[in-house]
């Protein structure tokens, strides 16, 4: 009975090793979404940046978890991150001035906008960070600076983390917190 169990364990380990080797080529090159790709990937969500003065502005802080420590820090689970910025206004464009990704130490990892962009009413843009991109660490965050030409519904900014731990899958959301609002 013990021999049979050992054989089963070895076969399972071999299968997992083969599976890992087969999946590595598909994930090794995965990194965070490139700066400037928001304009390309979400062209249908965008409109021209308003020529009028931006009278209202604000910023959101969004904690994200590209990695989570487990077992008293001995193990690490990695997660993909999707940051979503939703224009909650039905009538007015939302200008995004900055989408910046910071690591656990507060160091800028990547800036996702080359220039301000404007979201159409009720539209959304996203930034995706692959599971294999752990540059942010366990205390990563985004800062999203926004503006509008006048009174506007506050944008909805949140991050979805998805990953696997053992044979289970986990998904959770982190909501952005307003850290600055100027004008009304």
Show which residues each predicted segment covers.
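Bacterial N-terminal signal peptides that target proteins for export
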Residues: 2-15
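Terminal connector regions
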Residues: 34-46, 133-184
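Short, solvent-exposed loop/turn segments enriched in Ser/Thr/Gly
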Residues: 75-82, 140
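Short, hydrophobic/aromatic beta-strand segments
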Residues: 92-99, 110-112, 154-156
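Intrinsically disordered, low-complexity Pro/Gly/Ser/Thr-rich segments with frequent PxxP/GP/PP motifs
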Residues: 103-141
């Amino acid at each position: 009975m013990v021999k049979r169990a050992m054989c089963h364990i070895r076969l399972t380990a071999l299968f997992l090793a083969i599976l890992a080797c087969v999946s590595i080529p598909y994930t090794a090159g995965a990194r965070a979404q490139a700066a400037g790709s928001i304009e390309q990937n979400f062209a249908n969500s965008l409109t021209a940046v308003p020529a009028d003065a931006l009278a209202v502005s604000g910023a959101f802080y969004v904690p994200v978890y590209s990695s989570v420590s487990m077992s008293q820090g001995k193990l690490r689970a990695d997660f993909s991150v999707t940051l979503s910025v939703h224009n909650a206004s039905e009538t007015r464009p939302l200008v995004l001035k900055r989408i910046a990704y910071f690591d656990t130490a507060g160091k800028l990892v990547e800036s996702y906008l080359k220039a301000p962009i404007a979201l159409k009413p009720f539209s959304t843009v996203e930034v995706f960070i692959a599971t294999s991109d752990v540059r942010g660490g366990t205390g990563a965050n985004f800062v999203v600076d926004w503006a509008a030409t006048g009174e506007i519904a506050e944008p909805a900014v949140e991050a979805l983390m998805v990953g696997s731990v053992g044979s289970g899958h986990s998904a959770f959301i982190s909501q952005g917190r307003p850290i600055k609002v100027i004008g009304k």
